[in-house]
Amino acid sequence: MLINVVLIILLVGLNGKASGQNQGLCSPDENASCADSSDTQDEFSFNILRKIKKALASYQPCSSDANDANCSCHAAVIKSDLAPYKATGVSRQMIESSARYGTRYKIYEKRLYREENCMFPARCQGIEHFLLPLVATLPDMDLVINTRDYPQINMAWGNGAQGPILSFSKTKDHRDIMYPAWTFWAGGPATKLHPRGIGRWDLMREKLEKRAAAIPWSQKRELGFFRGSRTSDERDSLILLSRRNPELVEAQYTKNQGWKSPKDTLDAPPAGEVSFEDHCKYKYLFNFRGVAASFRLKHLFLCQSLVFHVGDEWQEFFYDQLKPWVHYVPLKNYPSQQEYEELLTFFRKNDALAQEIAQRGRDFIWQHLRMKDIKCYWRRLLKSYVKLLTYEVQPEDQLIHIQPAKDEL
């Protein structure tokens, strides 16, 4: 395997350098400082290769069935998210106390109902697209679905929300139950390129697959690439590295709705947006959290580029089976410019390894994040969730009947 060959070469090189030092190339007084940058990079490279090898050795694919018709890759997430309610069940009082933290939905007698006021209509539309085809197969149930960006049940807040509340993203500090975000069908951040949100994951998959095929690995630009707004200063060091070393990184800030002056783009004019398809021109793509998990991550993988994912606290339902060093390159929160430089330099020198990781990341998303996987996840989630209800669901006059939109009939 390629990783073993590279490790052996590095070991031989490191041992040779150690032997040379023992023969007097560095005096005892100089040992702490005489190693040059190539020595440092070799040691760094060895550590990275060791991490990759360890990750691959322990990695078990989530399904032996490439078709994975039962979306078994994501089943553990459902079990984990519902576990806090297994002992107590879900009572009517729990639903009522949680209602103000999300949008009330009800499935009753094979029909879907919702409270009339939806804070984000496009987001509700994206959710309802997946719920409507399922209602004929599901028992009666009440749901509280959060359409805000931020999860609602932080165990440290003590805000009275005991759940259950469904949210698209969370951290380990939250008890929200994750569901596939509305953006798989509608909504998402409104940008100049996508004024109504990215939407239609099925269509974007096909676009990115065609674009990636048109720009094979050997034709991609050997640069780190990022384009996005400054929703967090965690992204600043990559932008500053790009200004200092544009031969290594091409990263710039774009405008968002809160932009007022160049200070909001780190004292530079805002850059133009870049389509996901044009991200595929670059070998190394960076993903950062936003207010919560970033909607861009799943798109980046389909470029068949190497994804660098910064931070691991924010999750969506499919993140659990994406493994660091197997499918992507992990970085801790707030990486320094030096950390970016070292990793990019390493993967430039180990191009075949970079391509292998990129391919595994692409294959996982392509095989296990299809539209049928999204539908399957919703079905499995709701069938497991309804078993927790401890009361008989009743009709409510104040809820409105949701029917399929005309363009979905």
UniProtKB/Swiss-Prot annotation:
The record marks F120, R230, Q257 as: Interaction with the consensus sequence C-X-S-X-[PA]-C in peptide substrates. UDP-alpha-D-glucose binds at R227, G228, S229, R230, T231, R235, V274, S275, F276, A292, A293, S294, F295, R296. One of its GO terms (cellular component) is endoplasmic reticulum lumen. It holds the Pfam family Glyco_transf_90. Disulfide bonds join C62-C73, C71-C376, C118-C124, C280-C303. Pathway: Protein modification; protein glycosylation. GO terms for molecular function: glucosyltransferase activity; UDP-glucosyltransferase activity; UDP-xylosyltransferase activity. One of its GO terms (biological process) is positive regulation of Notch signaling pathway. It is an enzyme of class 2 (transferase). InterPro entries: CAP10, O-Glucosyltr/Glycosyltrsf_90. Residues 1-20 form the signal peptide. Keywords: Disulfide bond, Endoplasmic reticulum, Glycosyltransferase, Notch signaling pathway, Signal, Transferase. The active site is at D149 (proton donor/acceptor). PANTHER family: KDEL LYS-ASP-GLU-LEU CONTAINING - RELATED (PTHR12203), PROTEIN O-GLUCOSYLTRANSFERASE 1 (PTHR12203:SF35). Protein O-glucosyltransferase. Catalyzes the reaction that attaches glucose through an O-glycosidic linkage to a conserved serine residue found in the consensus sequence C-X-S-X-[PA]-C in epidermal growth factor-like repeats. Regulates Notch signaling by glucosylating Notch in the ER, glucosylation is required for the correct folding and cleavage of Notch. Belongs to the glycosyltransferase 90 family. This is O-glucosyltransferase rumi.
